[in-house]
Amino acid sequence: MYVELKNINKRFGDCQASKDVSFEIEKGKLIGLLGPSGSGKTTILRMIAGLEKQDSGDIYINGKLVNELTPSQRGVGFVFQNYALFPYMTVYDNIAYGLRVEGKDKAYIKERVTELLELVSLSGLEKRYPDQLSGGQRQRIALARALAPKPELLLLDEPFAAIDAKVRQELRTWLRRTIDKIGITSIFVTHDQDEAIEVADEIVITNEGRVEQVGDPVDIYLHPKTSFTAKFIGKSSVITDYGKLKGFNDEGEGTEAVIRPEFVELLTNDSPKGNDPSYEDAMVEQSIFRGDSFEVILDIDGLKIKANSPLVNGPLKSGDRVKAFINMIYIIRGEETYQVKNSSLDDSNTYFI
């Protein structure tokens, strides 16, 4: 493995930021550290970079134990959330900064800066200053500067957080394509699920300093292995009285159910399938238009459940009556999570994850 974290612990006063953190990264992979604020993901990134020292545990990069190495000795490039460009330097000088610190000659620096400007599609802007660039352009320059010394590992701390939504979407695609092109092993921190799912080869879910689950985006989304992951990923509804729902039995005391919006099929009352007894009678409690669909909160026998309604169903508003069929749910028992299909679909309906 190219990067290995083994039993990492880190405490800041009374707060344990990392609790026995262990995971591995293959060479050339793009990894997303995903979790809520305060979950420890940025601390992990900073310890890999050498900007924070772990209290215990080992970090390996390219087979080398780096515990005692300084950031400059680890061969790591770091892209900060707020760009951290030098405002008094031109684009050229910002990218060249690390190369000058390394003592590279002028010819090499010019060649490398030109190469990186082409890579980030900003050739011709080398004489501009950071305040003359857009947010997206500044982030590209920050990436070029991090790549200039040819690091072995690229670390990005919420690289798109300070950028508006449209540009952020474009930069996700661009970053994925750029990292694939140069083949550098990379780790980025984010609290945005869509970003992690779209960009990462693998996702590391963090919570309260612990690693909850590691896997590719599809596996993380479809097969959550812990209670936290099941509740955190997706726009889920969490309910305890799920035995009220048609096609599901209560699995016992201490259990709860997680229902994703895509598990719910909605019909208007005039639909031919509306008389199917397996469908729930539901009332729209809240409806938000999302452009390509309506995001709704349903009241089903007192249970609040999120769902999506396609435009073909027409506009939905608070108080509308609809029919809802719930295909499946995740049952959580302690830290065990498993899928249960609606019994009207299959007699053998339990699938352990």
Where are these regions (language model features)?
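ABC ATPase nucleotide-binding domains
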Residues: L30, P71-G77, Q81, L85-K225
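Helix-to-loop junction immediately C-terminal to a conserved catalytic motif
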Residues: A49
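Glycine/charge-rich catalytic "coupling/switch" loops of P-loop NTPases
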Residues: S237-I288, N313-I353
